Amino acid sequence: MKTRQELTEVLDFIAEYATYLLGSGVHTSRVIRNSQRIGASQGVDLQLSSFQKSTIITAHDEESGEAITRVVKIPALPVSFERNSDLSAQSWDALDEGLPLSEIRKRYDELTAKPRIDPIFVLLTVGLANASFCRLFGGDWIAMGIVFTSTLVGFAAKQRMQAHGVNHFLIFIISAFMASLCASAALRFDCSAETALATSVLFLVPGVPLINGVIDIVEGHILIGCSRLINALLLIICIAIGLSATLLMVKDGLL
């Protein structure tokens, strides 16, 4: 049987753990399963209900009948599949090894304190990936080079604006505009300019919210699933606005 103080400590940690996963792009069912594993390792029954901006978590000690509920804000964090995988594995370790809360907290702090991938490396790999999309859709080597350069400009601008806390809808509009405007340089060369323009903004497509939204709806988490899909749709509209602004400026060159 746990005291109220012990139950509060377990709940506070799981609330931090769950919101970190939700903010990092993990779909809802996985967060619930991971959180309940950690709760089970501490002898606590856990119930979680998540929304777009916050989550409600209730911890219940069956022996004492004590129950505590928290409403916690979900932070906006960069997506890291490696970190999400490590945190999911931690929940299994907690259950299989019967770890005490102090050890679980220690391992969690170590995982979340690990340095992220260097932004320059991310910038270069995103540029190469987008250039590969250009090739996949029929672009030639000149168009690929232009798309690579355009992606570097657009993604670097996105990174800087995110660092300064600019509204994310505005970030997508400006990044799409800058990337497509740079890609419009393809109109001056004998290359597949239309493909270069169209693929220059693909690095902005919000794949994680789209996938998570569908998974959440399929698994019964309708509210957060719909909100994620709506948010992804708004971001796609922002991409279209930025690209449309460029097309209005260079429309004569496309004719």
Q: What is each model feature region?
A:
Residues 188-255:
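Generic detector of multi-pass transmembrane helix bundles and their immediately adjacent loops
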Residues 1-99:
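Soluble N-terminal domains of membrane-associated systems
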Residues 1-12, 113-114, 239-255:
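N-terminal charge/polar-biased segments
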Residues 76-143, 231-240, 251:
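Alpha-helical transmembrane segments and their cytosolic membrane-interface
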Residues 107-111, 153-165, 211-224:
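C-terminal ends of transmembrane helices
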Residues 115-188:
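Core alpha-helical transmembrane segments of integral membrane proteins
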